[in-house]
Each structure stands twice: as structure tokens, then as C-alpha cells.
Amino acid sequence: MSSVRPYPLPGPTYGPAAAFPSGVDTVKARDRRGRERAISGNRLTSWAFAEAYGEPDAGTAEGAALRWARERAEAAGVRAVSPGTGDALRLLAAATGARAVVEIGTGTGVSGIYLLQGLSPDGVLTTVDVEPERQQFARQAFRMAGFASNRARLIPGPALDVLPRLTDGGYDLVFYDGDRLECLECLGESLRLLRPGGLVCYTGVFAGGRTVDSGPQPTEVLRLRELLRAVRERKDLVPALLPVGDGLLCAARA
């Protein structure tokens, strides 16, 4: 499998195979290399700062709930959104004035806490997961974060069975963190649920860099590529691919 640098810097490739040719001022060349490394380091530091920027203090109820939910996710081997992705979800929910949100893939409640933070005070999160045990963790995390029980509706079951039962055009935002093999099939259902101007968001679309890797990839990565292409080509969507966490694909329904 080939490796990919998602943010390549301009300039020469350095390493054993890229020695300075004769006649080159090696002092200046090494200075340039040092500057490029500094730029790369500054970018990584900036991205790390941005990822942690909006994370609530661990001493608050929401911060403690997020930490607890992340620990449960790690123990269960469940993907959880990064703090930067959570910040983006909270912002998008708040910016759209969302009162009704669907989440596909409850997990242990990490992303749900961010979405509830961004929802209007009377807003409701409808969250779907095939594993009821995980939803029990999420329910406890929401309670720890201070959200009333009527703010979240947890529905167990496969997404493709549950989504058709939800109301057409009744939601402001649909967030997908479910089975990557079903991401494309769930797109149509997600758009049906959205009001005009509503948002659909998919997390994890970089797949750890594999989405843009030219080497052989598993089926789930191929499905993510199909999803990215389908969203970009639809005339009724306004898409953006945000470089937060493991990639957040968002699209507004025109």
C-alpha cells in the first residue's frame, strides 16, 4: 500500500535519495529545508490547536461527560469524533438554528453531546444505532452533560430500517457516523428527511488517508469515494469537504 502525504509542501524531496547536486550552496539549501520543516511543524501545531480549541474544560459537566463517553468508546472499539469535528458539528447545528437533528451512529454519545450543545434549547436529537448497548452509554453521557431526557430520542436498529419511518422534510441536520458500506444508500434517505436549506454531514470520509491513497483499498473506502463523487455531482446540493478530524463532508440542500 502506498503512503500519502495529505498536505504536501512545495520544494524538493529530502532524504537519502535526494542528495544535494554538485554546485548547490548547501548552507542555503539546508536553511531552506529548515524553513520548510518549520512551516510543516507550525501547520501541524496549528491543526492540533484547532482540534482542541473548543473542547470544554474537563472540570465542567459537559467536559466530564465527553471524557467519560470517549473512554467508553475506546474500551468498546467504537470510533468517536475528534474534538475539532465535534466543534464543527456544534457550530453547524447552532448556525442553522437546528431544532431537529438525526444522528446515524449513536456510538457512546460523544457526537451527540456536541450536537445537543448546538441545538436550540427546545431542540431534539434523534439518534439511531444498531447496538442498543452503546445507546445506554450515550443516554448516561447525555444525562451527565446535563441534558434532559426529552432532548434525545434513541432508536435502536439498522439505519436503513429506521430512516424510512422518519418524517419527510422534518429535520434541519442529518449527521452520519454509521456503517461506511451503507453511506451511499443512506444519502437518499438523509436528503428526504431534510428541509430546504438543511445540512447533511458525513464524518470519517478521509478514512485515515486511504480515500486518496492510490493503492488497493477495501470496499468501505471505495464506497466513500463513490459518496464524495455523488455529493459533488448533485445539482441540488452545495458541498464542502472540511479538513477536521478524519474529514467532514457537509452539503446543504438547495
Can you annotate each of these PLM segments?
Residues 1-173, 180-201, 205-254:
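A short alpha-helical cap/connector motif
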